[in-house]
Amino acid sequence: MPFINTKTTVSLSKSKKDSLTAEICRITRECLGKGENWVMTGFEDNASLFFQGDSAAVAYVEVKSFGTPSAAGTSQMTGKLCHLLSGELSIPADHIYVAYYPTDNWGWNGSNF
């Protein structure tokens, strides 16, 4: 039940979104212990983002999850997400922010967990 939304200045094809989704699901399983059946991803490409006054290759990733993941898990996930986006989208790791938003209120299938 994490929702992982990636905003980036880079243009993404459908096939790139599909491959990123597969990798994000793998990373989420490894770092947070959440399987692919519970992961939702979103992509907002061609976003108007600026970092250090520059709008070149930039990304902002939001990880919203039910419950609070461990600090070790989120630290590991940040490293892997930055590595993924750097490799796949040529975004420098120092131009990527990853923010975590845990919540105890998460709804699915008509009710809350």
Where are these regions (language model features)?
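Interaction-mediating elements
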Residues: 1-113
